[in-house]
């Protein structure tokens, strides 16, 4: 005869408090979106920052977590340098950090930003082993006062390493946006990132092609510097959505130096592309979740 085994009450086998806090917090985040790339140098963080700003410009409450512990630059791209981070102490003795917010003089709904780049000097490297990186990411998820969010954007480091596994095992992602450029070497690694998200059973996966083309400032002709159509072909091959192309924008460097997302820096081709991509993403996620409500 087979009987049900009794429940064991062994100290240390329960859910640790940090994991429990993460689970409680993610209930308040309507959509959790990862932004990743198979390789570096494709403008992944630029996409994450501008997607965040575009959603906030549409009136949504958005938070962005920089999960690139060794190369954090999200804060700088939002105009936030090394700064004091304040925290609140709770009754059980744990502390939660208060994330800085930016609204660019009221242009957007206040964006909550958290990055290791705020906590260490710009020229100081973070030399941590995997276990410390894992703990840091979990703390940025669970020990920050994120509050209610329509969108939680998580900017992953390039590749398919531990940081991604930590996040995917900690929260249930709603979408993964994989960033590529038209170059063959980028497309090869992008395919690996797409397949990783498939194995992680992320419900919605899409590709964005960054640095897709350049509009000549003199003649207005379109120049395909890195090739043409690679991102769209990859998305079709992998059976995932293609959200759009973002052109090389000469004003992007100027905006970046000022700590302003290009989507908030005038009516430029890249700004238009990011707004269109954000609208497509919102509509797709509402369709998947059966939520037709407007913000």
From Swiss-Prot:
Q: What UniProt keywords are attached to this protein's entry?
A: ATP-binding, Hydrolase, Iron, Iron-sulfur, Metal-binding, Nucleotide-binding
Keyword Hydrolase attached: yes
Q: Which GO terms describe its biological process?
A: iron-sulfur cluster assembly
Q: So which domain of life are we looking at? A: Archaea
Per UniProt, what is one GO molecular function of this protein? metal ion binding
Under the heading CDD domains, the entry gives: Mrp_NBP35
Q: Which Pfam families match?
A: ParA (PF10609)
Positions annotated to bind ATP: 38-45
- Tell me which family the UniProt entry assigns to this protein: Belongs to the Mrp/NBP35 ATP-binding proteins family.
Q: Give the quaternary structure.
A: Homodimer.
Q: Which PANTHER family match?
A: IRON-SULFUR PROTEIN NUBPL
State what this protein does: Binds and transfers iron-sulfur (Fe-S) clusters to target apoproteins. Can hydrolyze ATP.
Q: What is this protein called?
A: Iron-sulfur cluster carrier protein
């Amino acid at each position: 005869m087979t009987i049900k085994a009794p429940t064991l009450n062994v100290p240390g086998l329960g859910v640790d408090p940090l994991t429990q806090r993460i689970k409680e917090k993610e209930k308040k985040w309507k959509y959790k979106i990862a932004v990743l790339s198979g390789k570096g140098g494709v403008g992944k963080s630029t996409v994450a920052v501008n997607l965040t700003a575009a959603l906030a410009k549409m009136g949504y409450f958005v938070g962005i977590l920089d999960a690139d512990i060794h190369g954090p630059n999200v804060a700088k791209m939002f105009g936030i340098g090394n700064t004091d981070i304040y925290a609140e102490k709770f009754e059980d003795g744990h502390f939660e950090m208060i994330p800085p917010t930016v609204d660019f003089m009221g242009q957007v709904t206040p964006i909550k930003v958290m990055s290791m780049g705020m906590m260490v000097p710009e020229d100081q490297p973070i030399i941590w082993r995997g276990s410390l990186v894992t703990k840091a990411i979990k703390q940025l998820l669970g020990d920050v006062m994120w509050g209610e969010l329509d969108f939680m954007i998580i900017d992953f480091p390039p590749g398919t390493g531990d940081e991604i596994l930590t996040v995917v095992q900690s929260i249930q992602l709603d979408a993964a946006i994989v960033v590529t450029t038209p170059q063959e070497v980028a497309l090869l690694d992008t395919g690996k990132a797409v397949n990783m998200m498939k194995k992680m059973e992320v419900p919605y996966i899409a590709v964005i092609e960054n640095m897709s083309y350049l509009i000549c400032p003199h003649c207005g002709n379109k120049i395909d510097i890195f090739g043409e159509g690679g991102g769209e072909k990859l998305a079709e091959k992998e059976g995932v959505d293609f959200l759009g192309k973002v052109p090389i924008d000469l004003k992007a460097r100027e905006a970046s130096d000022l700590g302003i997302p290009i989507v908030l820096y005038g009516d430029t081709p890249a700004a238009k592309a990011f707004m269109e991509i954000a609208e497509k993403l919102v509509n797709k996620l509402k369709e998947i979740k059966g939520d037709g409500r407007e913000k």
